[in-house]
């Protein structure tokens, strides 16, 4: 995703070495790769409402006219099982599970092919973890997503992964 440069080796996506891509090509590739972060308190802008958080990638990548953004944000909330009345709220007013769902919705806004999930459920209660894993599985089936799931919890991995790499 380009958040940090690789210290060794190469990172390929769709047959392309990301380190060798031009900034323009990398921007286009980033639309196809998104991230769900572990710490939603740090990854969601506290100065933006949920609608603003979901609108940001749509604006940056110019995916739809500005007047359509509120409707797109509402549909994204529907897809992650959140009520539309959360659009006007700020991240601090949401539960941990709701914030994680907003993070997932933000990742889905660009219709990526690959989503990197960095410990997406480790900060959540066990009951909410199961709901979140089921949501991720449902979204994967509906959208044909590929996940790279980073987790220390082998139970989460066994529930979610088709292939496993232990580091």
Regions found by a protein language model. Name each.
Residues 109-113, 129:
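A short, proline-enriched helix->beta-strand linker immediately N-terminal to the Walker B motif
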């Amino acid at each position: 995703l380009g958040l940090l440069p690789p210290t060794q080796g190469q990172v390929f996506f769709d047959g392309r070495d990301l380190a060798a891509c031009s900034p323009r090509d990398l921007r286009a590739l980033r639309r196809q790769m998104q991230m769900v972060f572990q710490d939603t308190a740090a990854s969601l802008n506290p100065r933006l409402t949920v609608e603003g958080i979901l609108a940001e990638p749509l604006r940056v990548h110019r995916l739809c006219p500005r007047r359509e953004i509120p409707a797109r944000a509402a549909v994204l909330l529907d897809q992650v099982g959140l009520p539309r009345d959360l659009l006007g709220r700020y991240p601090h007013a949401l539960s941990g599970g709701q914030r994680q769902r907003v993070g997932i919705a933000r990742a889905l806004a660009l219709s990526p092919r690959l989503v990197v999930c960095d410990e997406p459920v480790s900060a959540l209660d066990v009951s909410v973890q199961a709901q979140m894993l089921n949501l991720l599985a449902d979204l994967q089936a509906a959208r044909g997503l590929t996940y790279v799931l980073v987790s220390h919890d082998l139970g989460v991995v066994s529930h979610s992964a088709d292939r496993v790499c232990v580091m």
